[in-house]
């Protein structure tokens, strides 16, 4: 009997363009396949053994005759291609309308109100890469003390500040002000604190980022599990994505490997329920920066930890590895891409070689997890428990 699911989201590790990718400017995007082509092949032996290369239409990864895990891929039903939309959908919340984006920066009324409430002028207010904007405006920020506000193709309001100019506590308070403002017809998916350090135009972002999300619009997989008196243990930015709704405990992480370490720490306890992990380096450090070599290395590093994860699994555990969207580092765009997400599952009770094929919605993951944990629910989605269980 399954009593715990370990769900690991490899942030942005897409498995090829979705049929509507052209509507999002993402025709030809294929995060895994194009990275593999760019670096002369990916070496992911443990995910390959589980069936990664057996997923229908996946490119650049070896197929095996007898996978030890279940495998497949899922379509995004929601309108959008960002972190919040992807994680919410896999947890049972489908967005009929995309969250607001601000391709020309934020309107004057929003900025004026924000400046008044925080007692500081802001600089920036445009679409920008986070690493580029601190290079461009970091010196001015240090001279003036004005926080840097910027956005991207996603539904985000980002505030960058030097940790010695605006201390972390104050930066987080500033972001909470923005979060309270950006609702209703101004809604953004996330307000993100982006602290950095350094001097003289040589700045680097720190791992003290914080995401301030919205409450999910409907009840999620997490809330159903928590209400069932079970544990929802979140690693990385998961608790921020769900605005703590349905979370019983959480830990933030410094990088992917720290995320694996923290996941293992939860696995070594006897706590039943869900361990929900997001590993963001793929997206943040390599996808958005169009660095296929760095991305490939990060994938190979993660694959190198899978044996350790498997060794620490209990008989009642099921491991699931998936993604939330794409972010193909080989295309001109530095933004997310509208892609299928891969899915592999492993455990004592999982049928090796089980193919879930192409599912109609990420929400099938959440529905299946609740089914495995025997939690009654009204979640959208279709469970594939019967396909993957022995």
Curated annotation (Swiss-Prot):
It comes from the Bacteria. One of its GO terms (molecular function) is phosphopentomutase activity. It is an enzyme of class 5 (isomerase). Its main location: cytoplasm. One of its GO terms (biological process) is nucleotide metabolic process. Mn(2+) 1 binds at residues 11, 324-325. One of its GO terms (cellular component) is cytosol. Binds 2 manganese ions. It catalyses: 2-deoxy-alpha-D-ribose 1-phosphate = 2-deoxy-D-ribose 5-phosphate; alpha-D-ribose 1-phosphate = D-ribose 5-phosphate. It holds the Pfam family Metalloenzyme. Keywords: Cytoplasm, Isomerase, Manganese, Metal-binding. The keyword Manganese applies. InterPro entries: Alkaline_phosphatase_core_sf (IPR017850), DeoB (IPR010045), Metalloenzyme (IPR006124), Phosphopentomutase_DeoB_cap_sf (IPR024052). Its EC number is 5.4.2.7. Its cofactor is Mn(2+). It is found in: Cytoplasm. PANTHER family: PHOSPHOPENTOMUTASE. Belongs to the phosphopentomutase family. This is Phosphopentomutase. It comes from Clostridium acetobutylicum (strain ATCC 824 / DSM 792 / JCM 1419 / IAM 19013 / LMG 5710 / NBRC 13948 / NRRL B-527 / VKM B-1787 / 2291 / W).
């Amino acid at each position: 009997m399954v009593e715990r699911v370990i769900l690991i989201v490899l942030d942005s590790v897409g498995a090829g363009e979705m049929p509507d990718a052209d509507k999002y400017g993402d025709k030809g995007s294929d995060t895994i396949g194009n990275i593999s082509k760019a670096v002369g092949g990916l070496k992911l032996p443990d995910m390959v053994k589980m069936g990664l290369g057996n997923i229908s239409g996946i490119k650049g990864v070896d197929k095996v005759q007898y996978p030890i895990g279940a495998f497949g891929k899922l379509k995004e039903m929601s309108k959008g291609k960002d972190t919040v939309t992807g994680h919410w959908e896999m947890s049972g919340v489908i967005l009929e309308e995309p969250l607001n984006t601000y391709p020309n920066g934020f309107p004057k009324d929003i900025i004026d109100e924000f400046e008044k409430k925080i007692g500081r002028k802001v600089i920036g207010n445009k679409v920008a890469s986070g690493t580029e904007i601190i290079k461009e405006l970091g010196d001015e920020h240090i001279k003036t003390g004005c926080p840097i506000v910027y956005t991207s193709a996603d539904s985000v309001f980002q505030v960058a500040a030097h940790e010695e100019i605006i201390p972390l506590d104050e930066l987080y308070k500033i972001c909470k002000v923005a979060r309270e403002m950006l609702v209703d017809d101004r809604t953004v998916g996330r307000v993100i604190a982006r602290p950095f350090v350094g001097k003289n135009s040589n700045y680097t972002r720190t791992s003290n980022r914080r995401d301030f999300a919205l409450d999910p619009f409907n009840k999620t997989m997490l809330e159903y599990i928590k209400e069932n008196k079970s544990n929802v243990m979140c690693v990385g930015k998961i608790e921020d994505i769900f605005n703590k709704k349905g979370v019983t405990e959480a830990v933030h992480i410094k990088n992917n490997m720290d995320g694996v370490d923290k996941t293992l720490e939860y696995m070594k306890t006897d706590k039943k329920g869900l361990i929900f992990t997001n590993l963001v380096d793929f997206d943040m450090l390599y996808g958005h920066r169009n660095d296929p070599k760095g991305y490939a290395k990060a994938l190979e590093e993660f694959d190198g930890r899978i044996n350790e994860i498997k060794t620490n699994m209990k008989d009642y555990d099921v491991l699931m590895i998936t993604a939330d969207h794409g972010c193909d580092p080989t295309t001109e765009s530095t933004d997310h891409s509208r892609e299928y997400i891969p899915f592999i599952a492993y455990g004592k009770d999982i049928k090796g070689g089980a193919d879930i094929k192409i599912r109609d919605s990420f929400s099938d993951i959440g529905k299946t997890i609740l089914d495995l944990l025997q939690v009654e629910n009204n979640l959208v989605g279709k469970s594939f428990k019967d396909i993957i269980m022995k």
